[in-house]
UniProtKB/Swiss-Prot annotation:
This is Dermaseptin-3.3TR. GO terms for cellular component: extracellular region. Belongs to the frog skin active peptide (FSAP) family. Dermaseptin subfamily. It comes from the Eukaryota. Expressed by the skin glands.
Amino acid sequence: GLFKTLIKGAGKMLGHVAKEFLGSQGEPES
């Protein structure tokens, strides 16, 4: 439903922000 879509969108956005933030800190070793 709509709620699931919102959660998915929020997670995607957070993932992008986290990636950008970590990218500015330097690539994490994995």
